[in-house]
């Protein structure tokens, strides 16, 4: 159940926040400690809410006696739920329950530390409590996933959420984790706790279609330059696929623990970005022929506990070149970089009859790819010395690339759309294919692997168009 937090601070602001959210939410938490309203006005807000939660965070200067008195006065307003800190006296909870038997009690704990939530729950357990809320602070994505795993072992009357930016995915996954409450804020309001998402954000992530039976799709690696969450979630919604797509920042060092976690959680598909495309291969149960050919993996499919790796990067770029009527036979093609995407592209283009030239800052890495696909390897500084028909840039946007020209330039980076290399090439009259085109094509290939029973040919153009618009918008914002 979505629960929108009302913080005001004035009565008028609080009422507007509540009324603005009523179409999308029925449950509202009134933060009495943040509201500058009278008890009569607070009562009006409670009556406006179909389901109400009343919370008052005890300030450090408040005495135990004053705390109890304040909570007793709030109980007299008859909210649906009363949220009490874990340290609120047990005997006073029993007294409130005796006087107000219809009020349901939530016992909550917020901590800035990452702690074993099973132990926390055990410490909070009491017969007088209806619901429990645990808010903890994960230090990493693997911490986050371990917390999600632990949540499955707790009773269904327990809400577990993670604070901070790292913890945002736990809020998106809340219905899948069977949380009784999913806390959100009115659209346009400031967060009350770090990592809170707006009501519109939750709807964007397909909240109304999510349930404990839903599966999860995600992006792992350096997620900072991806627009995948902005393209994939609306696409899933259009197809009525009850699945969110979340970003999970991950380093190579975290892979062992990550793979333990995803086997215990309902993951269906995972996109893999740098720097994990080659590092991830030893953890796969099976490799598709595309991975065996390229030595790179950008797609995981999880079925019946088995993790299968695929590579759609090279095929995605080849689809783009085909759409642009680019015939590569007997052409000289330069690939800049020696990472996972460069490997994938070299593997696919090696079957087109073109002559491949691999350029990299560390020549030995270029040689490793070249030897595999009968290509030539060069230091990146030698790029201007070679005449080619096509340059495919697989280096990061911040890379310093020698000024070189070709009739057609492909830059596979989605964000930023423009960089010094493409700007120079465009100034000199070269045709440019930007990264959002390859992004869209490789993603559509991933969707076919994740959702083989769905037909979405009619939506492909809209998906590609959305990727193009987002890449342009983010470049303008930058």
From Swiss-Prot:
Coiled-coil positions: none
Stated name of the protein: Shikimate biosynthesis protein AroDE
Location of the region described as 3-dehydroquinate dehydratase in the Swiss-Prot/TrEMBL record: 1-208
Keywords: Amino-acid biosynthesis, Aromatic amino acid biosynthesis, Lyase, Multifunctional enzyme, NADP, Oxidoreductase, Schiff base
CDD domains: DHQase_I, NAD_bind_Shikimate_DH
Any single biological process term in GO: 3,4-dihydroxybenzoate biosynthetic process
GO molecular function: 3-dehydroquinate dehydratase activity; NADP binding; shikimate 3-dehydrogenase (NADP+) activity
Enzyme active site: 110, 133, 277
One Pfam assignment: DHquinase_I
Binding-site residues, shikimate: 226-228, 298, 313, 442
Keyword Secreted: no
Enzyme Commission numbers on file: 4.2.1.10, 1.1.1.25
Binding site for NADP(+): 337-341, 360-362, 435
PANTHER family reported in the protein's UniProt record: 3-DEHYDROQUINATE DEHYDRATASE
Pathway: Metabolic intermediate biosynthesis; chorismate biosynthesis; chorismate from D-erythrose 4-phosphate and phosphoenolpyruvate: step 3/7; Metabolic intermediate biosynthesis; chorismate biosynthesis; chorismate from D-erythrose 4-phosphate and phosphoenolpyruvate: step 4/7
Superkingdom as given in the UniProt entry: Bacteria
Catalytic activity, reaction form: 3-dehydroquinate = 3-dehydroshikimate + H2O; shikimate + NADP(+) = 3-dehydroshikimate + NADPH + H(+)
HAMAP family, sorted: AroD (MF_00214)
Function: Bifunctional enzyme that catalyzes two sequential steps of the aromatic amino acids biosynthetic pathway. In the first reaction, the AroD domain catalyzes the cis-dehydration of 3-dehydroquinate (DHQ) and introduces the first double bond of the aromatic ring to yield 3-dehydroshikimate; in the second reaction, the AroE domain catalyzes the reversible NADPH linked reduction of 3-dehydroshikimate (DHSA) to yield shikimate (SA).
Keyword Nucleotide-binding part of the UniProt annotation: no
Record-listed 3-dehydroquinate binding positions: 21, 29-31, 55-57, 171, 196
Source species taxonomy: Bacteria, Pseudomonadati, Chlamydiota, Chlamydiia, Chlamydiales
Family statement: In the N-terminal section; belongs to the type-I 3-dehydroquinase family. In the C-terminal section; belongs to the shikimate dehydrogenase family.
Annotated region (Shikimate 5-dehydrogenase), positions in chain: 209-478
